[in-house]
């Protein structure tokens, strides 16, 4: 199990999350073409284990699903009045903070009997990576910020009757985080790195109700996962002897709450050719009030404290499917995804903002037992203002982190591929 987790985390290197905050929406390849509209109701394949486990009652027989998402983000910072951290030079704009990323998911579902279904999913519900040039003007606020997760999610589904299905699952989630930055000590610059990891536990449940033979609605809930990341803080201050090494090279802890969400979806087969899908999802990002890292060396003093004060978010999506033939289905979708960070508290580590999704995709039934899905989405991200003022207080304090003031030009392209096989 440990080898599986390490391999998955190394392979899963998401950039800035493609849903609000540091959430990852890419949990199935078939759903991307619909911008994940109707995810809690469509129950198209075993990836429903994540979006709504009740949907397993709609998936026939034993099925395995494997998906891979290629995420290509762009996030260019444009300076508009930043101020250096005296006495250090200002530095450059930082280049593209985005990084090409690959995100996989895997699902397996089978029948226990006609009414009870079992499945298990392995995916990455949250992730973040921003990385700037080491000499950029915001280096004292952050250079590299990375969060990786892996979620193992066994689930059961029950067909209560011809109209109602229920599902329940549990989650074992591993999280690993790394933060790096430059440190201004007046006489020179030095670097610091903080990293830690932990396991956390949560659950999910959902229901699907078949209103008519062609129309159903679904609702699902995923719980928060609370973790206490434990790790190390490291720096290269020793040569200057300006700050006691024990305060900078030390064990650290940080509380991390990965938020709960609620989704309500609808799916309707309008006629032999067209399907209509919709979804509304609420996520409780307001729990992310502060990024606080504490020394675990007996002092319990604060090493890093950054106010975040995020807002809860809504995501709205709508989509259509066109059944071109018995073996080919075409998809299109739109979504509006609210950002969790406001301008007043936006940081260089997570320059989050609202997103608009435009998605296309197709599903091809290659053989009676094997299906291939492909999807593409472009995310239009609103112009993202930032004014992170961490200038030093009035003398005699000789140090500070400077002021990062400007705007991000950002967008994301996502390509997903999925293979589904029935045994």
Regions found by a protein language model. Name each.
Residues 12-16, 68, 362:
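Residue-level signal for alpha-helical transmembrane segments in multi-pass membrane proteins
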Residues 39-44, 49-62, 108-113, 160:
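Outer-membrane beta-barrel pore proteins
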Residues 23-38, 57-76:
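Transmembrane beta-strand segments of Gram-negative outer membrane beta-barrel proteins
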Residues 1-19:
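Gram-negative bacterial Sec-dependent N-terminal signal peptides
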Residues 9, 59, 286:
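Active-site-proximal flexible loops/turns
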Residues 20-35, 39, 83-93, 100-423:
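Outer-membrane beta-barrel porins/channels
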